[in-house]
């Protein structure tokens, strides 16, 4: 049995000039995930379920657990003195860690994705993304350090809190998964070099919003539902409503996750920096693809911290199909 800590140290040789800082950073995220796991499991007992009454910068009501997870992860990262600052879906602006100007990494995160599902005991997750800063080491970080395209990511991953808690991450050398053993307090390697199955057969989208979708997406949904034995259609529809949970299932079983633009969200709803980029990085490392319907997600240069984007991620052939439909059936 190999633990996450042992695995990370073992893989340090894959990085030239490795100093151990990235290893320590991933260890800090691991610690934050353990704390969140513990408190999610007793959330109904300690009054951290439900809405907090506050709104985040996007105008969304923050759940108590959103804020809790944000603070715990932030504290775990700051305590190691290896992160110069963070950007979070739950923070209006970047958070600069005083005294950590010497650090060369920044972290972007969605502390608790799908938190509205907590009250009904549905899987939720944590998403994280790691970049090397672009401003000089020794100075405070600025927004410039965070507004980098996804192809500059050093590492990315997620933690899914479900029937078991699992941490999945990549440093650009494959995707690896670790299951948390609460009796030992460690994450143990369960899958190495994960890949999407050759052919996907599941599509994940909130079909309740069908009438609001672009024409190309509507046509693609109909394509998924049509019978065609040569392409193993119809595909199966599965939608949990938690990006981490939907992505994780599709990674294991094969499929595509879709979150297109709508009239009320013309740029899409998912955040480029906190959700799209890390998941796109993982998808490509696992042999999949991620797109906004026209452009590779990892090539998009972000303009603002909380920028949104349409998002299609999963098996490469399925993402290519939806891109084709969007191109062939544009909105008037």
From Swiss-Prot:
It is found in: Cytoplasm. It catalyses: beta-D-fructose 1,6-bisphosphate + H2O = beta-D-fructose 6-phosphate + phosphate. Coiled coil: none annotated. InterPro entries: FBPase_C_dom, FBPase_class-1, FBPase_N, FBPtase, Fructose_bisphosphatase_AS. GO terms for cellular component: cytosol. One of its GO terms (biological process) is fructose 6-phosphate metabolic process. Pfam families: FBPase (PF00316), FBPase_C (PF18913). The keyword Hydrolase applies. GO terms for molecular function: fructose 1,6-bisphosphate 1-phosphatase activity; magnesium ion binding. Keywords: Carbohydrate metabolism, Cytoplasm, Hydrolase, Magnesium, Metal-binding. Binds 2 magnesium ions per subunit. Substrate binds at residues 113-116, 206, 239, 257-259, 269. CDD domains: FBPase. Mg(2+) 1 binds at residues 89, 110, 112. It comes from the Bacteria. Pathway: Carbohydrate biosynthesis; gluconeogenesis. Its cofactor is Mg(2+). Mg(2+) 2 binds at residues 110, 113, 275. SUPFAM superfamilies: Carbohydrate phosphatase (SSF56655). Its EC number is 3.1.3.11. Its main location: cytoplasm. Homotetramer. Belongs to the FBPase class 1 family. NCBIfam families: PRK09293.1-1 (NF006778). HAMAP family: FBPase_class1. This is Fructose-1,6-bisphosphatase class 1. It comes from Escherichia coli O157:H7. The gene is fbp.
